[in-house]
């Protein structure tokens, strides 16, 4: 918002509605979506996408190429590191009949003076009331799955990107979360705040295994300049019990059932004395060696930056 206009920004990870736990009606798309809509006046905006692969250790190449996954002719940005490829696509729309769709031009941006190991992408926008642009960052399908927008059959992992699809993904995601929070049995005071907290707790759960992370943060210091900045993206048995107790009290039991499945799996690989570890990776791994990333500054200069070395190589990025 500024003196000339107001824009509404919506970030979401698409989620299809589901009727029961782990019973998806549609495949999940590994997309990070940002929708920008100007709701009043005119507002200048700058979009920058600058991924840093493997915690800014790996270099990458960036190119702007034709996008075969959309109906009309336009460009997309590709970011390629040794282990991972991402692409950034967009789709435009308008909510007013008298308003035309915005034009988008992607350009390369050199951020090497800030320590980036590959070019970023930038787009300067001047949106007016009713204009909408949605950006989609994703891991593109493998070459064997690629098809152009006119292909008769396409992989479910690579649907044609249209404004109708984006609208459907947003409404489906809203439905999923609304359906989930409706399961709450809480009737006490500050209901809205309690439900907002429940949503935050739900986001700590890694659904493929049922694991619950202590916090979705790493190297966030307890105080500015301090060294107690650990990686909390792992499952502590004790901490998880507190999270699940809160959810159970609110009526959410599926998450507790899933965590018990996670525990039962861990019981198949107990310590020699028959005990469990105090913590595991979200995949159930027992090796949680922590490493320091000395090339990163940390939050407001708080060092060292720490992370666990057990995360999937290539999928750790900084935006």
Predicted regions and their residues:
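Acidic, mature catalytic/reactive cores of soluble proteins
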Residues: 1-319
């Amino acid at each position: 918002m500024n003196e000339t206009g107001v824009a509404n920004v919506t970030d979401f990870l698409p989620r299809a509605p589901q009727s029961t736990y782990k019973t998806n009606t549609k495949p999940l798309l590994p997309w990070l979506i940002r929708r920008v809509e100007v709701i009043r006046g005119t507002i200048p905006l700058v979009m920058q996408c600058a991924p840093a692969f493997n915690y800014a250790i790996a270099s990458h190449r960036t190119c702007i190429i034709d996008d075969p996954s959309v109906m009309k002719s336009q460009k997309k940005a590709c970011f390629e590191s040794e282990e991972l490829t991402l692409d950034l696509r967009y789709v435009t729309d308008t909510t007013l009949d008298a308003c035309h769709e915005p034009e988008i031009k992607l350009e390369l941006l050199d951020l090497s003076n800030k320590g980036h190991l590959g070019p970023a992408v930038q787009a300067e926008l001047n949106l007016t009331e009713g204009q909408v642009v949605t950006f989609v960052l994703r891991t593109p399908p493998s070459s064997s799955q690629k098809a152009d927008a006119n292909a008769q059959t396409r992989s479910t992992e690579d649907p044609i990107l249209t404004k109708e699809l984006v609208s459907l993904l947003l409404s489906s995601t809203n439905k999923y979360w609304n359906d989930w929070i409706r399961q709450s049995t809480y009737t006490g005071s500050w209901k809205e705040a309690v439900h907002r907290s429940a949503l935050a707790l739900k986001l700590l759960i890694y659904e493929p295994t049922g694991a619950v992370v202590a916090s979705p943060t790493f190297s966030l210091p307890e105080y500015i300049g301090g060294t107690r900045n650990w990686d909390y993206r792992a499952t502590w048995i004790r901490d998880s019990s507190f999270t699940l107790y809160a959810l159970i009290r609110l009526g959410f039991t599926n998450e507790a059932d899933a965590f018990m499945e996670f525990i039962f799996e861990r019981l198949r690989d107990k310590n020699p004395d028959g005990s469990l570890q105090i913590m595991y990776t979200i995949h159930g791994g027992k090796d949680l060696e922590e490493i320091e990333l000395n090339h990163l500054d940390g939050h407001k200069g708080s060092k060292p930056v720490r992370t666990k070395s057990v995360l999937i190589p290539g999928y750790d990025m900084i935006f």
